[in-house]
């Protein structure tokens, strides 16, 4: 049944958990053709955060993508097809006021997706990188309830920069982009113009 789905809890900071997720999906539905690396956390704002906090954000926002690619891409190359979708952020193209760890890891996630595309694109592996701005999820408002001004500023900066989209609207944009196999997926079109301004300002 093409509409069937299962929910599996997994800690993406654990390679074996991701491997188990892939194996469960394959057991239920057959080979994995499309993988969304979508987990993300913000991390504490500002400088001076503990190295353990940096490690946690790196594990979820970046290394989880690397782990999944290590598990899936060799098989995709062997059979000549597969699709890896990485959720980064507009912060991966611009920057994020507030959490340095979030901004750095989203830049890195974008870079890893681009590397995957350049390296394996001619071997049948397609890659897209989703870089939304404000989306109406709890993650967006994490800084609003922060006990620091910098954390609250991060939320205000994102919500003030453009429309806050509903998750369903973002999903529609993603589905259309995947049909056309676009690498860069921008649910907020204004992000592209901001990115161009950023490049021109250096």
What are these regions (language model features)?
Residues 9-20, 51:
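The beta1-alpha1 cofactor-binding region of Rossmann-like NAD(H)/NADP(H)-dependent oxidoreductases
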Residues 38-43:
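Conserved NAD(P)H cofactor-binding loop of Rossmann-fold oxidoreductase domains
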Residues 45-58:
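Substrate-binding pocket helix/loop in short-chain dehydrogenase/reductase
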Residues 49, 95-103, 115:
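Active-site loop-to-helix junction immediately N-terminal to the catalytic Tyr of the SDR YXXXK motif
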Residues 69, 105:
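Active-site helix of classical SDR
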Residues 89:
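Residue(s) in the substrate-gating loop at a strand-loop-helix junction
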Residues 118-189:
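SDR active-site lid
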